[in-house]
A protein has these predicted regions:
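C-terminal structured "cap/appendage" subdomains that terminate the fold
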Residues: 65-138
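An acidic, gly/pro-interrupted, aromatic-rich
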Residues: 1-74, 123-154
Length: 154
């Protein structure tokens, strides 16, 4: 039951799940017809640091590597189509490509950071993928999944 959708999340009366609280979940004390829209820095921090979202980003990063193509450019384009349903703009590709190279160099040099990122969550990191590459793509997936365009419905 770990990977069920949020609609099946157990709600406690006295203690609301922190992720739901950050995203303005209504209290159970009264009926709510329409939820307010908000976009706060706290929500961005939850999406970047909550183990649930870090694990989701790592799983998506593994898909980027396996299904996205052979080159980083193909993988970035694939990820944008999957998450945002649109093509990646050239400036976005350039920006994310340079960020990917920076993170790849960092994770190749720092084994402790790479290993700690691979242990977040309940799902084990795939053993058949390069750990540094997976960690770097996880960082990119976290950026893409935290875009305003991704989390805010228009």
């Amino acid at each position: 039951n770990l990977y069920r959708r949020g609609i099946y999340t157990h709600w406690q009366r006295m203690f609301l799940h922190p992720s739901l609280l950050a995203f303005d979940a209504p209290s159970r004390e009264e009926c709510t017809v329409e939820r307010p829209r908000s976009n706060t820095p706290q929500q961005a921090l939850v999406l970047l640091n909550d183990p649930t979202y870090v694990e989701a980003a790592r799983v998506f990063a593994a898909r980027m590597i396996r299904e996205g193509g052979k080159t980083s450019s193909q993988r970035l384009a694939w990820s944008y189509l999957q998450v945002l349903s649109r093509k990646i703009e050239p400036f976005e590709e350039k920006l994310l490509g340079s960020l990917l190279e920076k993170h790849l160099a960092s994770y190749r040099a720092n084994m402790a950071d790479r290993d700690s990122l691979s242990k977040v969550g309940m799902k084990a990191a795939p053993a058949d993928l390069d750990a540094a590459e997976l960690a770097a793509y996880t960082s990119i997936a976290r950026v893409i999944l935290n875009l305003h365009e991704t989390i805010t419905r228009q």
